[in-house]
């Protein structure tokens, strides 16, 4: 019995250590740092270039079969729903980065097989920060999920919230990165 308990504790510790090593970073902004104007949305009164930032990750846990990236602004004044800025899923398990500028509507620069969902701007692809003027700094949460399945079966036209639900249901670990922007 003691051997079984020890084995379980050891396995849980190894899993926790593995998940703790899972990291998401960007050479384009520091964790908790300001997001530059070139990544800001172009439209809705914002005048950025709407270029998606570069993202790199490492330390995905054993058993990862694909990834999904969700970018959300919980500070958006939407009655509590926040705002979805980017949704990418079916990223192959072999991928370790998303290059700057890959978030175009056609997703041509994304790792092969990746699919972009519709954002709250109404279309697929990166929709950069664009908070209301004078609303303070918003927190843009980039969450990379390591998934237990190779491919998520998501219907065409699914909302970002539905995609987020399916992603969370299949997630085995997350790596997070926070960026700030206000105007």
Give the ranges of each region predicted by the language model.
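Positively charged n-region of N-terminal signal peptides that target proteins for export
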Residues: 1-5
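N-terminal signal peptide c-region/cleavage motif recognized by signal peptidases
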Residues: 11-16
